């Protein structure tokens, strides 16, 4: 019997498809020689629901742990509240690969994708690289933050209560200036601690850890590796280190998100993509030297994209327009250490959650390669389940009556906390809003920037897409 293939997924967090093509020449070169899915759709608009969906092939809204209103509860961060994003007994992709005889290993630079959020369920080894990569540049500040986190939810409640009590002793005009000053100070402190103005956000450490794992612990069993690199995530290396990158100050109108500011952030993003592309080359080269590509399927993709002023939006975890829903998806097959030149370019809509079944098919021996045989999605779905930044919801709700700044941010967060679902079929895309905002319909082949809503002339098509979404089973590929 032939030996099972290694399967390695390199997930480049926050990389949007259009900019991957424009700013990552090595990835683009691989895509031309391998199999490239040109209309890959992320199942959700931020890390947690997207990974949860990819790991289970379930629609994100059907997973109770990821579909909560994090702004209302405040239970979003995995540190204070030790929140879980999948059930303890979830039969994840890693769990099922382990049952097929694979050694399953996770290398993560994302603090949500970790050993204690259950998104790592099923992996036999988890390298929480983010612990060092997200706090290596200001150890003193990191230690201070860690001491607060150890207090858990009780500590946060005390901090909120103390902040509100202090605000009540101030004149209202003073609350605004103090709150805004502290928020900007926090933004700069985080930037100083996590290397915002540097290019590397853990890629070098990831390559080192992967090489060390192969040298020390590789057991010659078939490998399923999942690697998350976070270089493309905000914040970004911009010219002035005093530049505020808090998206809620911009979305609320407190800071102006003009074209110059959006371009500045985008330039920083493209610098990171160029760096990430070079590290992708180094990672693939290391895997080849170590013999890990002798009989391997390599998948390169992302969990969501990023906004830079399009539709008046910034970053992600916002409404599902193309900039955040379309991601790169490239499958590369290696036989006897050499890349198989498939030269396939597929234009049909494919949800990245379809990787779940495609990878299991290779692991079980049903398929030998991933080269265009991944199931196209008749209706591909991308969901915005609400904003991810619910960490300060409780504080904002208590300060909003005394601070116009807090009120603006709180109301803006409420606005974008509205659920919305994008449903794709062929060239047509419906965005259905679960609130007091009208649905929108686009022909994304003719109008990829979604500038012209055509729903008034195509209501039957919009109804067809919405009905398909409502009637389908809670799996992403329907």
Would you name each region that the model predicts?
Residues 1-478:
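Catalytic domains that recognize anionic headgroups
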């Amino acid at each position: 019997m032939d030996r099972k293939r290694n399967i390695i997924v390199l997930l480049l967090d926050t990389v949007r498809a259009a900019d991957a093509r424009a700013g990552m020449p090595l990835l683009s070169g691989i895509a031309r020689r391998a199999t490239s899915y040109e209309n890959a759709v992320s199942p959700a608009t931020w890390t947690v629901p997207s990974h949860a969906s990819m790991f289970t092939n379930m629609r994100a809204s059907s997973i109770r742990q990821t579909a909560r209103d994090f702004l209302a509860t405040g239970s979003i961060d995995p540190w204070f509240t030790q929140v879980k994003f999948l059930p303890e007994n979830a039969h994840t992709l890693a769990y099922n690969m382990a049952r097929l005889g694979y050694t399953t290993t996770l290398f993560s630079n994302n603090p949500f994708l970790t050993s204690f959020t259950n998104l790592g369920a099923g992996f036999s080894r988890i390298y929480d690289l983010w612990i060092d990569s997200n706090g290596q540049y200001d150890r003193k500040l990191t230690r201070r933050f860690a001491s607060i986190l150890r207090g858990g939810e009780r500590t946060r409640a005390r901090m909120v209560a103390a902040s509100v009590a202090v605000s009540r002793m101030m004149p209202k005009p003073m609350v605004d200036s103090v709150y805004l000053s502290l928020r900007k100070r926090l933004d700069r402190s985080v930037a100083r601690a996590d290397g915002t103005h540097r290019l590397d956000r853990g890629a070098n450490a990831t390559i080192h850890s992967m090489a060390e794992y192969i040298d020390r612990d590789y057991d010659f069993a078939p490998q399923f590796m999942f690697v998350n690199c976070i270089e493309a995530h905000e914040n970004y290396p911009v010219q002035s280190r005093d530049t505020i990158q808090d998206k809620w100050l911009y979305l609320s109108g407190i800071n102006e998100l003009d074209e110059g500011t959006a371009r500045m952030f985008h330039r920083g993003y493209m610098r990171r993509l160029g760096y990430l592309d070079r590290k992708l080359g180094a990672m693939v080269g290391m895997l080849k030297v170590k013999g890990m590509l002798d009989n391997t399927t390599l998948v390169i993709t992302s969990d969501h994209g990023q906004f830079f002023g399009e539709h008046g939006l910034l970053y992600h975890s916002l409404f599902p327009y193309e900039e955040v829903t379309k991601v790169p998806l490239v499958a590369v097959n290696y036989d006897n250490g050499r890349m198989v030149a498939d030269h396939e370019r597929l234009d049909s809509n494919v949800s990245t959650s379809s990787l779940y079944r495609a990878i299991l098919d290779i692991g079980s021996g049903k398929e030998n390669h991933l080269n265009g045989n991944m199931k196209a999605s008749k209706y591909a779905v991308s969901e915005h389940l609400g904003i991810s930044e619910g960490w300060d919801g409780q504080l904002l709700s208590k300060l909003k009556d005394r601070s116009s700044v807090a009120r603006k941010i709180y109301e803006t967060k409420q606005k974008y906390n509205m659920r919305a679902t994008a449903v794709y079929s062929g060239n047509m895309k419906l965005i259905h809003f679960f609130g007091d905002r009208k649905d929108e319909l686009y022909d994304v082949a003719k109008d990829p920037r979604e500038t012209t809503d055509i729903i008034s002339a195509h209501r039957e098509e919009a109804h067809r897409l919405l009905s398909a979404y409502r009637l389908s089973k809670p799996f992403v590929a329907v």
